[in-house]
Structure formats: C-alpha cells, structure tokens
Amino acid sequence: MKFSYISSLPKGHNHICCKQAGRFLSSQADLKKYSESLCLPKTSFPIKPNVKGNNEKYFKSITSDLYEWQKENLNKEDSFVLLDGPPFANGRLHIGHALNKILKDIINRWQLLKGRSVHYVPGWDCHGLPIESKAIKANAERKSSLEIRKIAKDFANSAVQEQLMMFQRMAVMGDWPSRYITMSDKFEIAELKVFLSLLQKDLIFRQNKPVYWSSSSRSALAESEIEYDDNHVSTSIYFTFPVNSFSIDGCEYNNVKALVWTTTPWTIPSNLALSYHPEINYGLYQHNNSIYLMSDNLVPNLDFMQGAKRLASCPSDIISSFTYENPLLPKQSFPFLQSNYVTNDIGTGIVHVAPGHGMEDYLLGLENNLRPFSPLDDYGRYTKEALDGSLEGLEVLGDGGKKVISIMKNQNMIVKVSPYKHRYPYDWRTHKPLILRATPQWFISLENERKTAIKALDSVKMIPPNSRARLLGFLNGRPEWCISRQRAWGLPIPVLYEKGTKIPLLTVKSVSYIIEKMEVEGVDSWFNDTENNGHAQWVHPDYRNKEYIRGTETLDVWFDSGTSWTTIAPRKNKPLIDLCLEGSDQHRGWFQSLLLTYTAYQSKPEAPFSTLFTHGFIFDERGQKQSKSLGNVTDPEDVINGKLLKGKKLPYGVDLLRLWVASCDSTNDTNLGPNILTQVGESLKKWRLTSRFCLGNLHDWNTSSSVDVGELRGIDKLALVQLDKFQTEIRELYESYSINKVVHHLNYFMNSFLSSTYFDAVKDRLYADLPNSVSRRSVQTVLYHSLLTLIWAISPITPLLAQEIWQSLPDSYLNSSYQTPFHAGETHLISSLRSKVDLLDRKFLIKEYLVLQQLKYSINLLITAARENLTIKNSLEAYVVIKSKSQSLLSFLKNYSSDLPFLFNTSKVFINEIPENLKLASVTQPEVQLDYGVANISLFFSNQQKCLRCWMHTAHEDGLCDRCESVLAQLKR
C-alpha cells in the first residue's frame, strides 16, 4: 500500500513521509491515525513560481510604489545617491546593460533595507554619431541640420522609451518619471553653464593641431573615444630623400641619401622636415651604387643593407647644417631637425616629420616655425593641395596611399615595401582606423586640471583597487581634451565666427548672451535659419560692429554625460555622489569626464563621487566576448522568459536574471550561457524550497509563541548564533559591494547549515512532538528568525521572490503592518534576533557548534562505511556510542544529549556506555581528536523496533516509541 500525505518538504527532508507502509502498519486505519497526529508542514507557497501571477500581484509594490514611498517617507538627510552613467539611446538593450542596472538596483535596495532614502534618477546619453547616421539614412535627400536634429531626437526618444520599459522589466527601482536625458533643454543649458565656467577660467582654447580624425565618422575624436587594434597591418616603407651638398671634414660626398622608415606613406606629401637624435651615432654607408645616411646601430637590422660599406662617421651636431629635397615637391629644400623622440631600436634613426599628421611632429614644428600642412578633407581624402592635385579625391588609407608609393617608386625613392603589424587607433563606434589630421578644434586645457583631478582621487574608494592605476594612467596621458565635433546632432558650441576671416568670438559676455537666448528659445533655435533668427540675433550688442555667423561644431558627447553631476543637488558635508558604477571601459570615458568637468568647475581637488565601482564585460560559456558579429549576444528578455534555458519549459522570471547578475564576480569579466543559467536556476530553486520549509512549519505559530532564549534547546541556541554570524557576514559583504560573495554565503548557509544540519536535526521535534510543546516552539522560534533573515538577505537580489515569501507569511506576521520587506527594513526583520543572541555567549556557542560538526563528520564516515558494507540500509537503524575520558567532552555531550540522535540522524546516542545485546555495525573510530578531548566512536545495530509514527528505532513491540505513545495519549485528552 502506498501513502503520501505531504509534498511540501524540500528534497531530502521527507524522511518521515511514509511511501511504503503496508509492511509495518496493521491497517489503513492505523496509518491514518498516526499520520493525522503528526504536525506536518502546511503552506500555500508553491514549489514553482507563478511568474505571470507574481508580476501582476507584486511588481508595482516592489518597484515604482516602493520608490515613491521611500522618497516621501525616509530621511533625506541620510540619503544614498547613485549617479546613473547614461547608456546610449540607440537600439535594444543587451545583457551588459542588465548587468549594470541590476547591480545598481541591488545596491540601492540594500541601502533602502538599512532605512536610507535612495536617490536614483536613470539617465540616457542621446547625442552622437550612431543616432545621427540613422537620421541621415532615414531620409535619402539632403536635409538641413535642423531637420536632421528633429529626426535624430525622434530616434533617441523612441530608444529611451524602449530601453526604459526593459529596465523596468528587470525590477529596477528608480525615479523613472524624472529621468534625465542629455538632449533636453534643461540638461543642455546646465551643461553650457559648465562650459561657460571653464571659459571664465581660461581653460577653453582653439588650435590648429593634429587630432585623431575618424574619416568614417567625419569628426575629430578625443582619446576616450578610441580603441586600439593590436593586429592592425600597415604598409611600411624604407625610402630615401637626397641630401644637398653633403660634406664631412672637408670631404664631399655625392648622391648621399637620407634613409627613412615610416608606417604612414600617405603622409609623405605633407613632409616638411627630417629629424635625428643628438645622441645617436650616424654614418655614411655605401651599398651597391647608393650612399645612405643612417644610424650605425640599426644597419645590422636591415636585410637589404647586408654587405654595406661604412664610408664615414657623421657626427649628429653637423647634421643640422644639411638640407634635403623631396622629389615629390621639386625646387624646395627642407631642414634636418634635432629631436629627442627619435629612437634607436627600430627604423633608421632618421624620422620623416609631417607636423600636420603627428603630435610629436607638430610640437617639433612649433619649435622650428613649421606650420602644420594637412591636405585632407573630412572624408580622409586628399585635396587638390596634395602634390599639385595628382592625388585629389583619393582616400589616404586606400588608393591614395597606394598611389603615393607608386609615385615614389617612379622617382626611385623606395628601397623596400613590407607589411607591418602594430597597435593602431580605431574609432570605437565605427571600428574603422583613424588618422592624425591637423584641423582647427576646440580644446580644454588639462595641464593643471588633471593634476587637480588626480589629487581628488586620493579620497575616492576604487573597486576593484587595481582600477585606480588604470584611471590614473588615462588622466596622466591627457594634456588637453578635444571637445569639438563636426556633427549636427549634439549640443552646439556657443561660438561665433567673423564672416570672411573666420576669427572666432568666444568670450564670457558673448557666450552668456547666447545661453540666455537658448534658455528662452530652446537649443534647437541655434540651427534655425529664418528671417527672425538670423546670425545677427545671436550677437551681443557690444559686438555688432562686425558681421558674425554661428559655428556648426557640437560638443563631445563625453562632455555631455560628464556634466551629469549637475542633475544632483549638493549635500551638506558629504560628497555629491556616493557611488558611480559602470563598466571598465568608462575609465577612458565617463569616469574621466565626470571627474575632470567637476574638479575644473569647482577649482579644487574634490571628486564628485566617494566610490567608483568598475565591472567587467560578459563572455559566453566558451570564453568568447559577446558580440553581434559572433552571433552570441544575449538578450536579457531571453533570460527572463526562459528561452535561454535548454530543455526548461518553466521560466523563472526576472529573479533568474537578477540572481545571475548577483552571482557574477562583477569586478572581473564574467560568463553567461544555458549551462550557467541552469546552475543559477538550481540556486533559485533552493532558495524557494528552504523558504517553503520554514513557511510550512510555521503555519500554526505567531510571535506570542516565541520561546525565551533561556528556554531554547541547545541546538536551537547554536542555530541562533549561526544566524547572527551569518547576518554579520552578509552585512559586511553588502557594505563592501561584494554581491557575488553574498550569493555564495547564502547558498552555503542554506545548504551546509540549514538544510543538511539544522533542518535534519529538528524535523522530528517539528513533526512528532506535541504541537504546543516547548521543544517544538523552540524550533519554530529559530525558523521564524531564519525566515526573516533569509527575506532580509535575498530581498535586494530577488525582490519578487522575497515579496512572494512575505505575502505567504501568516496574517499575524509583519506583512500585515508593512507592505514589503523594504517597508519593514532591517530594524523589524533582524534586530530582534540580535537582542536574543546578545544574551548568549557567542564565542562559546560557535566553538560548541564546531565540535558537534567534527563529531558529525566522524560519525558520517562510520555510517557510510556500514552502508557500503550493506550492514545497514538506513542510518536510523544504528545507535552511536561515544566514549571518552575527558570530563569536558563528557559534560559537553550530556548538555546536548537529547539533540545528538537527531543531529547525527541515528536513533540513539550513548555516552560512555554500551547497552547489552548490541552488535557492532561498523569499524570503530579510535581516538577522534576534538576540541574538548579525545573520543572513541562506534556504530551499533539498533536493538529496538522501528516506531510506526516517527520511524526512530526506539519502539516497543506494539510499534510505538515511548515519546509517540505519550504524545498520542495527550492528544486524546
């Protein structure tokens, strides 16, 4: 006969539930009588979540309603401010967005649990090339800047709405109605006022100098917008320039050629000089019919110079007196210039100088009155100024560069052409190679400001600590910040240019006037060319003696997002922002721009944030970085709806996505895939079942049933101390933002302590003792605190699961007074446990728990051996005998004597005695060393019957043990 009367126990916790009882019970009536006398778990909390139903019931209360409640009711003097690094308002969200936003939400919810009000206003970065490109493609015919801006704004607004809804699907709590977007007039005016402040401090300047230029974006880029390809292959050439009138020590040499190496042949039409190093030894070398000037040290490196004959030494101090010709530019002579940046480990020791195409070349040119020459257009094509128009229209990184080499070959200038693999800058948005091109651009001087910013970082906590060096490295490498962009979709730089001369007008008076006009008419009015909005309308009256036109350049998008600190209200005696949390790529981007704009604006070494948290990137299960080209990008929606789980029909909902995020060591790169999600799903299931066990066994209990700490059983006191220790550890981990370690501790605590130790040790009392007995209420007291502790610990990570548990508590619990665990806060969730544990000797009880664990481990070894030898089938068939000469150990064991059988999952434990007629069931473990002394442990066969009610082998011939007979007798009264 089969009988199963309970399904609410977690796996491994149903040893009381009778599956095959006919062998032991005389009748079905007996079975029913005994089963009905047990206090079995009862709960409506399901094993599997009803995702759709839970969303409908709980979602609003733990997101938008909760944020508004805390905003209105919690103390704003102790607020926690997290500034949202704005994602780009372009396209659908990917899993990296989920990682970022959910990490922020977990931290915000933890602060809320502590009773702090949270200020979190999500933001979006709305300007930039990708959106502008979409706007241009959407309308093939040529549009005005104003029309492009209108279309771009529509695209950005649409993306913001789509992304906002997806973030809300992730249960991210925030002030969504007050979100900031960098294209709003309010944000842009605040940004322009920061620009004005920097102008007042003489930090804004214009210069015609080489900048990184993206031909694919048709705009200048800042260092923060550049990525590097370590496998880029350039065409390198060894080539020659003929030296004029070469003589050394009165000896003349004819047809001497300077041997030069370059990886940018396309810059040869812009050559204005050659440079050499004053400390390098140079010589003249004859090879075949040519005489070359080059570094002595580098001759052996060149295969084509094998067998070359050294004719003479050429001291570096006389090289400056020489000139050379460029056969591509006849009838001109060019100088040799001394430079310390020339190296002696690669090339020839002589460097081709093009001040229009390299920063070092530019600086050398400034020292020697060489104006930068860069005959290129915005598309990276030669203009007619290059080689008398022979290269016009050709792309320098394509056919143009090839044609230059061809022309040089025709002039017998080329010695060798070869591919050269090296690190090369790319546009981080278009992923196309960049060039260095001299164009007039606007800059922020960082020579002093970066020192202030670096000093400000001294008071900032960096997570992980090694991220500090990365950020400092970027700051140290920025003498200025190129802030102008040649795009229509962006915040316009409020500069006017004199008509004809193009001399810029950028004064405090002019910029202030323009900003005031924009505040009234809107930023878009700058691009509106109507009769009532001509250029003259934007000119301050003091400057109307000349004719000016409005500039078309816009500000770098990093300047946009970098001024997002303007959305935060200052706080007394506190940093503006408690936390900024973004991906590791933001060391070169937002983290820098936020810090630099703020410290420059404040003119003091004070960072806007107190903590910077950097998370890594996401790879698939094979360790490949997720990218569209590889087809391995994960859509967060596929995690939420269960699509990514192989063979799993049941979606776990947003809690699965959130638990995966929490499980990641976010300070490093992390992995995601079906197998990983399946493991996370198992953890989530464990959290549900552990909570369900507590709920089921608290169905008949309320706070008035709580047992005073002094009356608790020994094992229950130990459990409370372990709970308190767990709370301390969890609190420390949340405070240090070690979220993945919170998950690890949760899983370990549920598995190693609650499920495998405590629950197993107390189930007999829960099910078989009298319902209102102190022994049973003692367990329930611990379960009550365990459940509230679990709710407290998991709420920031899986708020939906926590709310579902909260709503499943009996009506007499806290949920009748507080809508969510966050409303209750940790004061009501866990403080009462601390007051109980304060009455106990924590250190002493922790030590005693460790001794019990040592004993349990040794006994489990004996039980395992007995099972493997087939001497017993079930550990309840065994008795344990512990012998010792240590009075400390004996005293300790007697204090826990009533709990030991249940802790060890055996029917009886004897201390320093062996009843008659017991047979040894396993090999004895001699001299087990414990903290209280040495013990000998033996395992014996039980000599009593299996109790038909509790299954312990402690029964008489009538089928019930003494305890169960007593309980049944009292239940009949």
UniProtKB/Swiss-Prot annotation:
SUPFAM superfamilies from the UniProt entry: Anticodon-binding domain of a subclass of class I aminoacyl-tRNA synthetases, Nucleotidylyl transferase, ValRS/IleRS/LeuRS editing domain
Presence of the UniProt keyword Ligase in the record: yes
Subcellular location: Cytoplasm; Mitochondrion matrix
Gene3D superfamilies the UniProt entry points to: 1.10.730.20, HUPs (3.40.50.620), Valyl/Leucyl/Isoleucyl-tRNA synthetase, editing domain (3.90.740.10)
Tree of life domain: Eukaryota
EC number of the protein: 6.1.1.5
S-S pairs: none
Coiled-coil intervals, chain numbering: none
Keywords: Aminoacyl-tRNA synthetase, ATP-binding, Cytoplasm, Ligase, Mitochondrion, Nucleotide-binding, Protein biosynthesis
Cellular component terms (Gene Ontology): cytosol; mitochondrial matrix; mitochondrion
Record InterPro entries: aa-tRNA-synth_I_CS, aa-tRNA-synth_Ia, Anticodon_Ile_BEm, Ile-tRNA-ligase, Ile-tRNA-ligase_type1, Ile-tRNA_ligase, M/V/L/I-tRNA-synth_anticd-bd, Rossmann-like_a/b/a_fold
UniProt motif ('KMSKS' region) ranges: 625-629
Sequence motif: 'HIGH' region, positions: 87-97
Catalytic activity: tRNA(Ile) + L-isoleucine + ATP = L-isoleucyl-tRNA(Ile) + AMP + diphosphate
GO biological process, one term: isoleucyl-tRNA aminoacylation
GO MF entries: aminoacyl-tRNA deacylase activity; ATP binding; isoleucine-tRNA ligase activity; tRNA binding
Binding site for ATP: 628
NCBIfam families cross-referenced by the UniProt entry: ileS
Similarity comment: family membership: Belongs to the class-I aminoacyl-tRNA synthetase family.
Protein name, UniProt field: Isoleucine--tRNA ligase, mitochondrial
Protein's organism: Schizosaccharomyces pombe (strain 972 / ATCC 24843) (Fission yeast)
Gene designation per UniProt: ism1
